[in-house]
Swiss-Prot record:
Gene Ontology MF terms in the entry: ATP binding; ATP hydrolysis activity; DNA binding; helicase activity
Binding site for ATP: 291-298
EC number(s) recorded for this UniProt protein: 5.6.2.4
Helicase ATP-binding domain segment(s): 278-448
Superkingdom of the organism of origin: Eukaryota
Region (Disordered): 1-84
Protein name: ATP-dependent DNA helicase Q-like 5
Gene3D superfamilies: P-loop containing nucleotide triphosphate hydrolases
Similarity-based family: Belongs to the helicase family. RecQ subfamily.
């Protein structure tokens, strides 16, 4: 069954709270002059004239964007004139996107503009003073809250509105639109204009006529003046920022840091926790930062990156997160990223800029730290001032989103291999137990914890009991107030097929909705997210994959179609609503059958001691004990052989490397089977020139004229790295000498020490993995218990139903994150069943050919597939999922008893 793995999006920053009903501007001291534009405006080829749209005063940035007029707007004021009551800054529209899927083109939007490019282009970046007041006569206007469709409230007068240089009026936690990217200064300038050949022809004739009349030369002169003004202002902006950075280096005072914040980001003050974290980092103190989703955690490493002399290395779990964070770097910070999704030439270019000192912030995945060549650059020449561990809860096996690759992010490695001077660990959701584990691993003192409330107070939380008609219940909810008036809604599901099914159902009922999950092509995911951000889509029905890089502050509601897997997941996902500070609504549909199904799936990563023992025996086999031999484990075949998921095998191998005893050293994962075809020179000729080619000929077998060989075996035979072998055959390919294909993805490692007792090590690992499995189940039980309590409390108080449920859930969330998450939570799973053992006995007798373990039988009875017992085969038996309501451990115990009896009976029959 397809479902998306949990992922955090806590780096996504949010708009600071705004007043619900902003005022109209005060009196205008001196009216602005209307000046004809300098630049030419394209006209339609149609002979019919259209009425012009009426002129309006400058809009309030917090007000909802108006519906574009079908008529062309009036000519905008020229940017050459400086006597306007405000300045117009060129900014990129939120709806700007590229519809391509390639990594390089996705990343191209994230690139920054250098000073030299500013000087040559002159239009990519228009720096302006950060704050300019707009003065206008007082006027009472109707305003709509950004997250509502309709509203009828008249705005009372308040203080003057301030325009910021980022051009969008939002707070400093959603969009840093100073990256110098080319965009339209007037987005609707050419709207409605014909793009036909005749239109361009007419424009060209008109321009030539003006040149003939002497007007063309005047226009060119004025455009040249505009170019010079832009260059001067850009140089002035950069000079001001450099002065502010120098002032902070001299004295990291609150005043100097706030001035730098204002210049680069355009905001007057820091949010709670930001300034404290920045000052600790600049002081060289490793810090643990826990801020709510959307509270601006990324700013806490961006400002230090400007000040500190070395590189800031940001470790992030997903490529999509890295691309988003790179895209939102301000133009003054030069950034880059390294990912396995890049083409070789892209990675080479990034490494070149890194070595030349061009890049200040580098985004990498934790797997990159396995690359010996990458680490050697930092040991030899590059200086790392700060290592940022984003989504730091992934370090802890007790978190809701444990990732084995994060286990290698230990302070000892970061300080020794990268020579890091300071560590910043960031997360939005972490319990006390998780924080202790993360801070211990990264050696962050307990006094260096900055933790703010993990739940904002502008939510109305609610839960309802649902069943087979959940889709109908969802439709009824969305067609009732206040949801029917909310402009942007996210609906979270657990399974990929649900997103497509529910979004289609909503569209059939005239609700503009789209499904989103990790199985969609990258370009489709980008298009859906950007359409949602620009309000072209009202509802996104998504798995937990949605939310990374979400740049939208006015999401008005989050609806959970199923119970989340943990409190952390729930808080993280509802945190994507209400980032503009307005009241937002979060509803959860609780269904007991779905809860039991998710509880069964929580056991899918568990393993038996027998399977762990077989796995360790293979890892430490006689063939692998040779000194410095590069060993490999083909993932697909090993997964079926040991009935383990890829993630579980990776967890065990990582623990063998980073545990109390280092038994092995992990190497980069790669496709180990290479099929090589020689084209120009003969194999023997190339072998005479290259030791690697000679080793390939010795270690390969010829099949239909093709040489098939194992890359680790070739590398071990001549004592070189696997990357050297790959580099050699790639170089031959570039010369046209060979072509090759790679297959069989495998874990690669080198044995450093063999365990004395496999059984003892197997028992230790099984106990550790069982605790992780139990922790996952317990988190689901706690979330389920909180939802049920909120349902039951709705009829026991004089408060309104919404207020009662909100208080109940808030109380549970507070207790969970500030207490011990190991607190007992009753499970709804049945602890015994009269017919269970009888059915297991029948099941074993009817499937004598299979080799079962107690866990394999329990999974089948719960309707959960595994690598050795896939859904496609075993879902056909009538025992599949029959005992989903019975506790998994109870079934395992019954299965173990029946397996012993079954073996004894077979042995007796054999004798």
């Amino acid at each position: 069954m397809d479902f998306d793995s949990d992922s955090d999006g806590s780096h996504v920053s949010a708009t600071p709270p705004r007043d619900s009903f902003p005022s109209s501007p005060p009196q205008l001291q001196s009216p602005a002059k209307h000046v004809p534009p300098v630049s030419r405006k394209m006209t339609s080829s149609s002979s019919r004239s259209k009425p012009k749209a009426p002129t309006h005063p400058p809009p309030n940035p917090s007000q909802e964007a108006p519906v574009p007029s079908p008529y062309p707007p009036p000519p905008p004021p020229s940017p050459l004139f400086t006597n306007l009551p405000f300045r117009i800054c060129q900014s990129q529209p939120a709806r700007f996107s590229s519809s391509v899927s390639s990594f390089s083109r996705l990343c191209s939007r994230a690139s920054f503009t250098s000073v030299e490019k500013l000087k040559s282009d002159g239009v990519d970046f228009v720096p302006e003073p950060p704050l300019v007041e707009v003065i206008a006569p007082p006027k009472s206007v109707r305003r709509k809250p950004p997250n509502l469709i309709t509203d009828t409230i008249t705005s009372p007068p308040v203080k003057p509105m301030v325009f910021r240089s980022n051009g969008n009026g939002e707070g400093n936690f959603v969009k840093l639109n100073l990256n110098g990217k080319r965009g339209k200064k007037f987005p609707s300038k050419y709207k409605g204009v014909s793009k036909s050949r005749s239109s361009y022809s007419f424009r060209g004739k008109r321009y030539k006529k003006k040149e003939a009349d002497g007007d063309g030369e005047s226009l060119l002169e004025e455009e040249s003046d505009l170019q010079k003004q832009i260059e001067d202002e850009a140089n002035g902006f950069i000079s001001s920022v450099e002065d502010a950075i120098l002032a902070v280096k001299t004295e990291a005072s609150d005043e100097n840091l706030t001035k730098l914040l204002n210049l680069v980001y355009g905001y007057d003050s820091f949010r709670d926790g930001q300034l404290q974290a920045i000052k600790m980092i600049l002081g060289g103190s490793s810090t643990m930062l826990v801020l709510p989703t959307g509270a601006g955690k990324s700013l806490c490493y961006q400002i230090p990156a400007m000040i500190l002399p070395g590189i800031t290395l940001v470790v992030s779990p997903l490529v999509s997160l890295m691309i988003d964070q790179l895209k939102h770097l301000p133009s003054i910070i030069k950034g880059g990223l390294l990912s396995s999704s890049q083409r070789p030439e892209e990675a080479t270019e990034t490494l070149r800029k890194l070595k030349e000192g061009i890049i200040k912030v580098l985004f990498v995945s934790p797997e990159r730290l396995l690359n010996v060549e990458f680490l050697s650059m930092f040991r030899m020449s590059l200086s790392v001032s700060l290592v940022v561990v984003d989504e730091a809860h992934c370090v802890s096996e007790w978190s809701h989103n444990f990732r084995p690759s994060y286990m290698r992010l230990k302070a000892s490695m970061l300080f020794s291999e990268l020579k890091a001077e300071c560590i910043l660990a960031m997360t939005a959701t972490a319990t006390t137990m998780t924080l202790q584990a993360v801070m211990s691993s990264l050696e962050i003192p307990s006094t260096n914890l900055i933790q703010k409330s993990q739940l904002r107070d502008n939510f109305e939380l609610s839960v309802s009991l649902s069943g087979a008609n959940r889709m109908k219940d969802l439709l009824i909810l969305m067609e009732s107030p206040p949801y029917k008036e909310i402009r942007s809604i996210i609906v979270y599901c657990k399974f990929q097929y649900e997103t497509d099914m529910i979004s289609k159902y909503l569209r059939d009922n005239n609700i503009n909705a789209k499904g989103y999950h990790s199985g969609l092509p990258a370009k489709d995911r980008v298009r859906i997210q950007e359409s949602f951000c620009s309000n072209k889509i009202r509802v996104v029905v998504a798995t937990v994959a949605f939310g990374m890089g979400l740049d939208k502050g006015d999401v008005g509601a989050v609806i959970h179609f199923s119970v989340p897997g943990s409190m952390e997941e729930y808080v993280q996902e509802i945190g994507r609503a209400g980032r503009d500070g307005r009241l937002s609504y979060c509803h959860l549909f609780y269904d007991n059958d779905t809860y039991l199904k998710l509880r069964s799936l929580a056991h899918s990563d568990g393993v038996d001691e027998y399977a762990v023992g077989k796995f360790l025996t293979h890892v430490f086999s006689t063939e692998t004990k040779q000194h410095e031999k590069i060993c490999s484990l083909v993932i697909e075949s090993a997964s079926q052989k040991f009935d383990m998921k890829e993630e579980v095998m990776q967890t065990i191998l990582t623990h063998l490397e980073l545990g109390e005893v280092q038994y092995l050293r992990m190497l980069p994962q790669l496709n180990i089977c290479c099929t090589l075809n020689f084209h120009k020179s003969s194999p023997n000729t190339l072998a005479a020139r290259s030791a690697i080619v000679a080793a390939i000929l010795k270690k390969s077998h010829v099949k239909q004229g093709l040489h098939v060989f194992d890359i680790p075996a070739v590398a071990s035979s001549i004592c070189v790295a696997t990357t050297d072998v790959l580099a050699e055959i790639q170089a031959l390919k570039m010369k046209g000498e060979v072509t090759y294909e790679l297959k069989d993805s495998a874990f690669c490692y080198t044995i450093l020490k063999s365990p004395k007792e496999i059984c003892s090590l197997s028992s230790h690992l099984t106990k550790w993995l069982t605790e992780i499995e139990s922790c996952k189940v317990r988190k689901l039980d706690i979330m389920s218990s909180a939802a049920v309590a909120a349902i039951s409390v709705s009829n026991t108080s004089e408060l309104s139903s919404g207020a009662k449920q909100t208080r109940s859930l808030q109380s549970r969330i507070f207790d969970y994150f500030n207490g011990d998450e190991k607190c007992d939570s009753p499970s709804k799973a049945t602890q015994n069943c009269a017919f269970l053992r009888a059915d297991i006995k029948v099941f074993l007798q009817s499937n004598r050919q299979a080799k079962f373990t107690p866990r394999a039988i329990a999974r089948i009875m719960h309707g959960v597939g595994s690598p050795a017992f896939p859904n496609s085969v075993w879902s056909k038996t009538h025992f599949w999922g029959r005992y989903m309501n019975v506790d998994f451990r109870v079934i395992m115990e019954a299965a173990q008893t029946e397996l012993f009896n079954f073996v004894d009976r077979n042995a007796a029959l054999a004798t």
